[in-house]
Amino acid sequence: MDRTRIHHIGIVLPNRERAEQFMDIFNFQVDCEEYVEAYHAQCIFTKCKDQEVAVEFIIPTEGVLTQYNNGKGGIHHIALQVDDVEAVRKEYEEKGLKMLEEAAVPGACGIIVNFMRPKYGAGILVEFVERLHEDSV
């Protein structure tokens, strides 16, 4: 796997009000917001002064994410930025490690993503993020 860095921490929340409360407490601002059809969720990427790693709030509208942590939400995943999500998928699958998707899917705000199944990541859901252009999150 080529260059990696922590891109963001994903937090599932049951509603927008909870995300706004969190942002108010910690002085986060919305950097980019977009609905991700593949996961039926409104995704809000944040920024904060001197913050190198983004926080992504995931507000599901339907599907399995609505039941995450019994519907209360919580820290969901850690995301690693890579140069080529598809190359990462192939590399790990050659080692017998499976991803959630057969191919990368569109994420919010100019990225494509895929997730390594938690059983291969020491119980942690790891997302791989590829930025599609310079102004992607």
PLM features: what roles do these ranges have?
Residues 6-13, 23, 46, 53-58, ...:
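Short, structured motif recognition centered on aromatic/hydrophobic residues
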Residues 60, 78-85, 104, 131:
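Beta-hairpin (beta-strand-turn-beta-strand) motif
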Residues 1-39:
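Long, hydrophobic N-terminal alpha-helical segment
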Residues 6, 38, 61-70, 74-76, ...:
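A cross-kingdom feature marking solvent-exposed beta-strand/loop segments within repeated
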Residues 1-2, 6-14, 35, 44-49, 55, 66-91, ...:
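Vicinal oxygen chelate
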Residues 15-28, 59-65, 89, 124-128:
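Short N-terminal helix-initiation segments at or just after the protein's N-terminus
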Residues 16, 49-51, 61-62, 83, ...:
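Short loop segments at secondary-structure junctions
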